[in-house]
C-alpha cells in the first residue's frame, strides 16, 4: 500500500491544558508520513511555546501563528496551507487512537473512495465512557451516508473522525463567524464524493467539556444551529429528494434542541411572560 502525505489540522486556541495529550497521540501514530499543522489562532496562554516546541522536536510538525479569527477561520487556514494529498482534523482538547490515521486511510483505499469515516468514544468528566464502536466497514452511496447523518446513525456532522481527499475542499470552506460550523460544512464535503467508506471501529476520543461553546447553556449564537440545519436540509432535499423526510426530521430536531436549551436558562419563564 502506498503511503501518501496526510495533513492533520489542529485549530489551536488556549488549550495549553489539553494539547500535550493530543499531540502525544498524534506524534505516536502508526502511519508515519504525516504533516501535523498547528494553527495557533491568537492564543493568550502557553500554547505558543508548546507549539513551537513540538515543531523543534519533530520535523513533521508545522506551526502557523495568526490573529484570532475563530475555529472556522483556523480550519480554513490549515487546509489552505496543507501539502498532503489527504486531510484530517483533530480538535486539540481531544485525542486519537494510535492507528487513527492508518485505519481511516486503510478503509479509504480499500474501497477506493475520497472520504472515510470512523466512530468515536465520548469521555465524560466522571470517568465514564460512551463506546459504540464495533468491527467491520463498508462502502455506501452519498445518499445513504447523508441519510445516516441526518438520523444521527453511525455518522455525524463533526469535522473530525474523517479523512478527506484534498480535492473535496476546492469549493468548500467552513463559515467564519458561526458556531455549528460542522453542520454547515460536512454534508457539502460528502456531496462532493462519489461514494464514502464507513468504518465501525472507534478511533477518535472526544472529551466532553461542559463549558465548551456547543455544550454550554443557551446563548443567542446557538440559533446558528437552526440556520445551518435549514440550509443543509434545503440543499440535501434539492439534490436527493428521497431524503426529504430525513431532512425535515433533522430540522425539527434542531429546533427542539435549541428550545430545550432556552428552557434551561434561569428566569426564562419570567422573560417569556414579559
Where are the regions a protein language model picked out?
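A structural signal for alpha-helical segments
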Residues: 220, 242-243, 270
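Amphipathic alpha-helical repeat scaffolds of TPR domains
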Residues: 249-261
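Membrane-interface aromatic/basic loop that binds lipid-linked glycans or pyrophosphate carriers
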Residues: 265-274
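Short, charged, amphipathic alpha-helical segments
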Residues: 244-250, 272-273
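Secondary-structure edge/capping motif, primarily at the C-terminal ends of alpha-helices
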Residues: 236-240, 262-266
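Nucleotide-sugar donor-binding/catalytic module of glycosyltransferases
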Residues: 1-234, 238
Amino acid at each position: 500500500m502506498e503511503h501518501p502525505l496526510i495533513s492533520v489540522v489542529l485549530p489551536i486556541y488556549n488549550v495549553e491544558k489539553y494539547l500535550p495529550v493530543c499531540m502525544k497521540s498524534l506524534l505516536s501514530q502508526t502511519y508515519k508520513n504525516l504533516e501535523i499543522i498547528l494553527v495557533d489562532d491568537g492564543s493568550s496562554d502557553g500554547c505558543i511555546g508548546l507549539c513551537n516546541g513540538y515543531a523543534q522536536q519533530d520535523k513533521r510538525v508545522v506551526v502557523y501563528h495568526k490573529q484570532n479569527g475563530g475555529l472556522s477561520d483556523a480550519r480554513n487556514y490549515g487546509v489552505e496551507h496543507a501539502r498532503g494529498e489527504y486531510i484530517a482534523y483533530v480538535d486539540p482538547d481531544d485525542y486519537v487512537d494510535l492507528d487513527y490515521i492508518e485505519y481511516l486511510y486503510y478503509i479509504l483505499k480499500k474501497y477506493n473512495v475520497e472520504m472515510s469515516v470512523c466512530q468515536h468514544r465520548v469521555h465524560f468528566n466522571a470517568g465514564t465512557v460512551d463506546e459504540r464502536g464495533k468491527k467491520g466497514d463498508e462502502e455506501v452511496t452519498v445518499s445513504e451516508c447523508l441519510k445516516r447523518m441526518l438520523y444521527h446513525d453511525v455518522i455525524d456532522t463533526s469535522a473530525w473522525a474523517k479523512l478527506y481527499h484534498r480535492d473535496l475542499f476546492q469549493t468548500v470552506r467552513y463559515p467564519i463567524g458561526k458556531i455549528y460550523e460542522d453542520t454547515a460544512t460536512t454534508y457539502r464535503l460528502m456531496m462532493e464524493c462519489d461514494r464514502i467508506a464507513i468504518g465501525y471501529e472507534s478511533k477518535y476520543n472526544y472529551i466532553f467539556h461542559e463549558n465548551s461553546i456547543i455544550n454550554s447553556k443557551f446563548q443567542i449564537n446557538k440559533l446558528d444551529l437552526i440556520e445551518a440545519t435549514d440550509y443543509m436540509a434545503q440543499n440535501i432535499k434539492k439534490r436527493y429528494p428521497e431524503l426529504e423526510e430525513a431532512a425535515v426530521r433533522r430540522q425539527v430536531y434542531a429546533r427542539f434542541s435549541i428550545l430545550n436549551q432556552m428552557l434551561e436558562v434561569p428566569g426564562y419563564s419570567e422573560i417569556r411572560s414579559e
